[in-house]
């Protein structure tokens, strides 16, 4: 009786309770993962494949090779998927850095996506994307022509053709082409309202930074100038990773003003604001 009431946790030699599942509808669940790709370019550098699959239809809603597998690049991959296929109800990912961070949580929360993480070191939980990874290794990576390894652009061009073909072939489990299965429920998709600008804003990163004594803040390792009046204060910023021209300071009223990277040479020749008054310590009492 005690053992029935207090089941023992699964040990290394015990199998986990895994049950096959499938989303009830298209965009009900997306699964995402990263796969090591080939070395490309000169000098050769490792490419990483980021991919997202729709659980119900098995359609690959986004796939691309990137030079760095990090939070910023995955946000870009997710943005591609949302722009072309709508907003999923859930996003199922692992615990790697690109998938477990505050910015992705904020983005998903703003879009109404439930962000779910698999148990640590339990890649098998994301069965559909893992099976697709195996298919891609056997059918795409193993037959990749040498010219496709000249750069990320060439590699992604080959990948796009292969993914388009994959989405048009009948899937072994559903007996239906992923693209066809997805299109059958196109009337149920939810897209971001407000067009491209609203989609862009939904993927803006948010941070709060303390303003240094030289009226700068640091974002992703780079300094940006802010108004002198904010020295010592906390500044809220919105920015698009990787785009220095898309960094904004949030005002007390919620308004946005663009800020620029610090130019130390320009600052050296800038006119200094004189104090409102001065004291001549050379005069006697």
Residues covered by each model-derived region:
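Short, flexible loop/turn motifs enriched in small residues
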Residues: 41-48, 59
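Mobile genetic element proteins and their domesticated derivatives, centered on retroelements
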Residues: 33, 58, 78, 91-94, ...
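C-terminal, beta-rich DNA-binding module of retroviral/retroelements integrases
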Residues: 167-285
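Basic, flexible linker segments flanking DNA-binding modules
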Residues: 1-38, 123
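Acidic/histidine-rich, metal-coordinating catalytic segments
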Residues: 84-102, 119-121
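Charged alpha-helix within mobile-element recombinases
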Residues: 105-200, 241
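A short acidic/small-residue loop/turn micro-motif
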Residues: 54, 66-70, 264
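Active-site beta-loop-alpha junctions of metal-dependent nucleic acid enzymes
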Residues: 45, 63-87
């Amino acid at each position: 009786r005690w053992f029935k009431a207090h089941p023992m946790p699964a040990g290394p030699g015990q199998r986990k309770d895994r049950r096959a599942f499938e989303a009830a509808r298209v965009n009900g669940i997306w699964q995402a993962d990263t796969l090591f790709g080939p070395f490309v370019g000169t000098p050769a550098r490792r490419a990483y494949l980021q991919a997202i699959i729709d659980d119900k239809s098995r359609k690959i809603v986004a796939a691309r090779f990137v030079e760095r597998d990090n939070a910023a690049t995955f946000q870009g991959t997710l943005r591609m998927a949302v722009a072309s296929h709508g907003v999923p109800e859930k996003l199922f990912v692992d615990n790697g850095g690109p998938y477990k961070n505050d910015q992705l949580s904020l983005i998903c929360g703003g879009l109404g996506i439930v962000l779910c993480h698999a148990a640590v070191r339990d890649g098998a939980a994301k069965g559909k994307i893992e099976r697709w990874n195996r298919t891609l290794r056997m059918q795409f990576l193993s037959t990749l022509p040498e010219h496709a390894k000249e750069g990320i652009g060439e590699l992604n061009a080959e990948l796009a053709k292969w993914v388009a073909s994959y989405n048009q072939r009948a899937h072994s489990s559903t007996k239906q082409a992923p693209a066809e299965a997805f299109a059958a429920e196109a009337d149920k998709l939810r897209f971001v309202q407000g067009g491209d600008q609203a989609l862009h804003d939904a993927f803006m990163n948010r941070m709060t930074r303390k303003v240094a004594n030289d009226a700068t803040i640091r974002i992703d390792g780079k300094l940006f100038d802010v108004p002198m009046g904010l020295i010592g204060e906390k500044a809220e910023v919105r920015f698009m990773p990787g785009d220095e021209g898309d960094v904004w300071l949030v005002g007390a009223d919620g308004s946005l003003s663009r800020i620029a990277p610090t130019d130390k040479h320009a600052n050296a020749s800038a006119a200094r604001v004189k104090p409102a008054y001065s004291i001549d310590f050379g005069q006697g009492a």
